[in-house]
Amino acid sequence: PYLKESHGSVINFASGAGLFGNYGQCAYAAAKEGIRGLSRVAATEWGPDDINVNVVCPLAWTAKLEQFQQAYPEAFKANVKMPPMGHYGNAELEIGRVCVQLAMPDFKFMSGETLTREGGMGQRP
């Protein structure tokens, strides 16, 4: 009820794993694509109530990624690709700010969309 009253915004998170077909990530990619599908349907169903729903697919440096790098440096080097921009995104600055923008009234007409914030990673072969 509050979402209808507030004409709010919903921002869900998915992953490039589903968009780009990352090797060895079948279950993870399927789950994240489910989020994208759910979000598109919600955007259609909730649009008449002036609720917009979008998805962000981030690639950010996280504590878990850092733990993996420290625990398994060779596996990290072999398996974790660096985006073309040469660094992973900063969760607060490069991911968080786009989420704030998506929740602003200026972006109200944007709904059912997927935004990637992955430093060009999707351009890699």
Regions found by a protein language model. Name each.
Residues 1-9:
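A short helix-coil junction within the Rossmann-fold of NAD(P)-dependent oxidoreductases
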Residues 74-93:
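Catalytic Tyr-x(3-8)-Lys segment
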Residues 31, 39:
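Active-site helix of classical SDR
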Residues 52-60, 103, 116-118:
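Conserved SDR Rossmann-fold cofactor-binding beta-strand/turn motif
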Residues 15:
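Residue(s) in the substrate-gating loop at a strand-loop-helix junction
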Residues 47, 52, 110-112:
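Short, small/polar-rich loop/turn modules that mediate ligand/substrate recognition or access, typified
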